[in-house]
């Protein structure tokens, strides 16, 4: 098990993708009234980037697991009504819940609220998410907005307020449009559905500058019982390891003890969302909430050492990695996903740190965008990762093209390497960078994207 990451964790007890259409990040000029049924038409779904394993994709996202419903509607929180901006995910029973949160000291009001709620109750029933205002750096009034929102949802669902968790995304320094939110909640609750459409509408509603929504669900068999894990996430910019402007909600019908669930979620986050980077900025709002309903019929998983726990952990890792890769793939202005794989390190944590260093390098990202196979930038970013290794054991490959072996540069076809980068960019595909630093058993991955002119344009005009 890897050592704890820097994020904070609090605990309480095949999908067929829609055809992908690249959209402009400019918001449509029309204003609409959006229902759950029409919500998914406002933005395309991300490609499915699920790792291979003993599981299969199923329909439903966060509603695939037994006991969960979701909805996404337009509630008037966005500056323009181009797509939904309020989402709700609920569980029919008291769910065991774990949450991971930003390491940014300027934590948003919903983050502070969730930490408090998770410290006072061992169960959860719902997650409310708004897009448009981050409700970060908003002081006591912003915190009260989060409390009032949770209280209103709790009354509509007839559950305790501390069983409601809150996530927000949008412009930092802006409080939520509470009147619009509160007025929309009855319609949001009335729209809840266990259907695929319910899950898809919620996944759309939480997006901001995202070009695509991110939703996934899988089914696997553990102990002879079919269990499902579903999830949705948002993120495109302000993405960097140790959580970023990314929100995630995970659902499962497995039954897991409180302590085991907390550790499993922490481990999966460290192998997925903490291993992605777009721009090096760590947000005030990042938050992943994971709920386990226990309705699958599988006996409670009570030990991390059990075969059942190990099988479930692998599946949870895969779902979170699939969502994390979709976020990096959808990086603001990106033309391709970058996947960095490191082997031969002393342990998993060291391999992960090296991979993050390479994926985070602005020079590596710019070289990929320029279709320049400048392997020296890769070697440099491995070297400043903070991990000690024998430089004479360093191997680097770009796709199937070896660039360095045992610390020595290799002759290679620069035109072929450049063409590999160009083809990946033209197809919005994946650039694979493989690195070996020795003969140790530590392996790790990280994901990023190239750095384009468009990224600067998007963020220069974000609030104007």
UniProtKB/Swiss-Prot annotation:
The keyword Metal-binding does not apply. GO terms for cellular component: chloroplast. Substrate binds at residues 208, 234, 245, 332, 459, 464. The record marks 169-170 as: Involved in the stabilization of negative charge on the oxyanion by the formation of the oxyanion hole. Pathway: Amino-acid biosynthesis; L-arginine biosynthesis; L-ornithine and N-acetyl-L-glutamate from L-glutamate and N(2)-acetyl-L-ornithine (cyclic): step 1/1; Amino-acid biosynthesis; L-arginine biosynthesis; N(2)-acetyl-L-ornithine from L-glutamate: step 1/4. Coiled coil: none annotated. It catalyses: N(2)-acetyl-L-ornithine + L-glutamate = N-acetyl-L-glutamate + L-ornithine; L-glutamate + acetyl-CoA = N-acetyl-L-glutamate + CoA + H(+). It comes from the Eukaryota. Its EC number is 2.3.1.35, 2.3.1.1. The active site is at 245 (nucleophile). Its main location: plastid. Belongs to the ArgJ family. This protein may be expected to contain an N-terminal transit peptide but none has been predicted. Heterodimer of an alpha and a beta chain. This is Arginine biosynthesis bifunctional protein ArgJ, chloroplastic.
């Amino acid at each position: 098990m890897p050592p704890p990451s820097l994020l904070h964790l609090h605990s309480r007890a095949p999908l067929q993708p829609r055809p992908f259409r690249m959209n402009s990040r400019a918001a449509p000029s029309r204003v609409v009234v959006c229902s759950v049924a029409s919500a998914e038409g406002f933005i395309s779904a991300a490609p499915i980037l699920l790792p291979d394993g003993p599981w299969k994709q199923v329909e439903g996202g966060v509603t695939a697991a037994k006991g969960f419903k979701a909805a996404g509607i337009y509630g008037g929180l966005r500056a323009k009504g181009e797509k939904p901006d309020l989402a709700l995910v609920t569980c029919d029973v008291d769910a065991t819940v774990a949450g991971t949160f930003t390491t940014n000291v300027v934590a948003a009001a919903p983050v502070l609220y969730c930490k408090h709620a998770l410290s006072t109750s061992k169960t959860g029933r719902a997650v409310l998410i708004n897009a448009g205002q981050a409700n970060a750096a908003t002081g006591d009034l912003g915190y009260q907005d989060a409390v009032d929102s949770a209280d209103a949802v709790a009354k509509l669902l007839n559950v305790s307020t501390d069983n409601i968790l809150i996530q927000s995304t949008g412009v930092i320094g802006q409080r939520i449009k509470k009147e619009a939110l509160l007025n929309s909640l009855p319609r949001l609750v009335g729209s809840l559905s266990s259907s695929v459409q319910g899950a898809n509408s919620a996944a759309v509603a939480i997006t901001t500058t995202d070009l695509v929504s991110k939703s996934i669900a899988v089914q696997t068999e553990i102990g002879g019982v079919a269990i499902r894990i579903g999830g949705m996430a948002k993120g495109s910019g302000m993405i960097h390891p140790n959580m970023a402007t990314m929100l995630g909600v995970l659902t499962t019908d497995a039954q897991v003890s409180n302590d085991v669930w907390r550790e499993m979620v922490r481990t999966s986050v460290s192998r997925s969302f903490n291993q992605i980077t777009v721009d090096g900025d760590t947000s005030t709002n990042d938050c992943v909430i994971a709920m386990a309903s226990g309705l699958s019929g599988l006996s409670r998983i009570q030990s991390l050492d059990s075969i059942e726990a190990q099988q479930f952990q692998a599946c949870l890792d895969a779902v979170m990695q699939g969502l994390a890769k979709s976020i990096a793939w959808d990086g603001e202005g990106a033309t391709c996903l970058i996947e960095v794989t490191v082997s031969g390190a002393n342990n998993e944590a060291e391999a992960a740190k090296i991979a993050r260093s390479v994926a985070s390098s602005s020079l590596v990202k710019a070289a990929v965008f320029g279709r320049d196979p400048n392997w020296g930038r890769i070697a440099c970013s491995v070297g400043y990762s903070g991990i000690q290794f024998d430089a004479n054991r360093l191997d680097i490959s770009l796709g199937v093209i070896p660039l360095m072996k045992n610390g020595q540069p290799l002759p290679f076809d620069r035109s072929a390497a450049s063409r590999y980068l160009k083809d990946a960019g033209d197809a919005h595909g994946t650039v694979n960078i493989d690195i070996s630093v020795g003969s140790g058993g530590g392996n790790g991955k990280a994901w990023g994207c190239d750095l384009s002119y468009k990224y600067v344009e998007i963020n220069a005009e974000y609030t104007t």
